[in-house]
Amino acid sequence: MSNDSIKLIDEIGKKARKAARQLAWLDSGSKNATLHAMADALIACKKILQVENEKDLEAGEKNGLTDAMLDRLRLTDQVIASMAEGIRQVAALPDPIGEINHMRRLANQLQVGKMRVPLGVIGIIYESRPNVTADAAALCVKSGNAVILRGGSEAFHSNRAIAAALAQGMEKGRVPSDAVQVVSTTDRAAVSALLKADQYVDIIIPRGGKGLIQRVMDEATIPVIKHLDGICHTYIDADADPAKAIDITFNGKMQRTGVCNATETLLIHEKVAKTILPALAKRLNQADCVLRGCPETIRLVGEVAPVIPATEEDWDTEYLAAILAIRVVKNLEEAMDHIDAHSSRHTEVIVTENHATAMRFVREVDASAVMVNASSRFNDGFQFGLGAEMGISTDKLHVRGPVGLEGLTCEKWIVLGDGQLRS
């Protein structure tokens, strides 16, 4: 790790810690006004953003980035307008800071409760999408946190330009400009330095591919909020409505394949597999979805659609593509055993009209979200009514599921007395 990287992160960390203290108890009106000013600044700086973005696009083409990656990188007029609107939507969300819950009076007349407060300084490490810079900044400002952003080198110029525009907006409000800082180097050693800056940073949130998240897990000396994989299952029960089962599975797999809440494995009860699988396989095949199935799946689907024999590796694979692994199971217990053995604890779905079966699945299956008769694709902050999110956590500490504003806060105990002494 280079001394320059350590020095850079040390300087940024000190500024962020000071800004976090100033921001922590800024009133909601001031934060919201600042967020609107930040959104306005993005629109006002559109031409500058696109000039800087073009540098990243040209470098990306030279470095062989795929068309899909270049598309995610590109800051069109629509993308910039969407970023600004996203900031305004965050401003419209309820402010969780200062909420007091569970306040009660004890026998000795002490009043004891919990107050919601910011985490402090959040480090966010992410890849490709420069819009994350604006999204993360907005969520952190609203939740009273300072943020240190380290985007991918492929979006280096874009991220710096977005941060500079946001700083112009913050200058018009009461939010200290150091509350949002970008690590202004492509040196990978700076990532290592940030992951070990526990004297300044309270939480690390990685957003990106498995390689990035694994590196963060291996190197960080700071608590991490993350999900490593999205191996999500849909289980079609013996008491499932066939039409619902087909629609829910198809939507979970095909509505958008390259995301963490897409269904990767279908489990189906043997009693309904004969009637549901052929129709489902035909529909998936027509949508160019590759099927990988157990021997019973291959037998039941027959000539309706091609099915590749599944291997043990398939049950542990997050495809992020139009590929679905299928296994026929004898009962609910076998389905839950399979999920327990292979799930990434992200999103699990049951399709059934049997309430008792559904409630048992909800109680016993371990995941950040369990769906009954609904697509796995609904595990999302916007879909849950939380507004913007920082990602979806499969951890059990400190937050689980979509990480919205409340997930970027914690609680502290408050005690109100009138001279009470402990005997």
Curated annotation (Swiss-Prot):
Keywords: Amino-acid biosynthesis, Cytoplasm, NADP, Oxidoreductase, Proline biosynthesis. GO terms for biological process: L-proline biosynthetic process. It is found in: Cytoplasm. It comes from the Bacteria. Gene3D superfamilies: Aldehyde Dehydrogenase, Chain A, domain 1, Aldehyde Dehydrogenase, Chain A, domain 2. Its main location: cytoplasm. It holds the Pfam family Aldedh. Pathway: Amino-acid biosynthesis; L-proline biosynthesis; L-glutamate 5-semialdehyde from L-glutamate: step 2/2. It catalyses: L-glutamate 5-semialdehyde + phosphate + NADP(+) = L-glutamyl 5-phosphate + NADPH + H(+). GO terms for cellular component: cytoplasm. It is an enzyme of class 1 (oxidoreductase). PROSITE patterns: PROA (PS01223). GO terms for molecular function: glutamate-5-semialdehyde dehydrogenase activity; NADP binding. Its EC number is 1.2.1.41. Catalyzes the NADPH-dependent reduction of L-glutamate 5-phosphate into L-glutamate 5-semialdehyde and phosphate. The product spontaneously undergoes cyclization to form 1-pyrroline-5-carboxylate. Belongs to the gamma-glutamyl phosphate reductase family. This is Gamma-glutamyl phosphate reductase. It comes from Magnetococcus marinus (strain ATCC BAA-1437 / JCM 17883 / MC-1). The gene is proA.
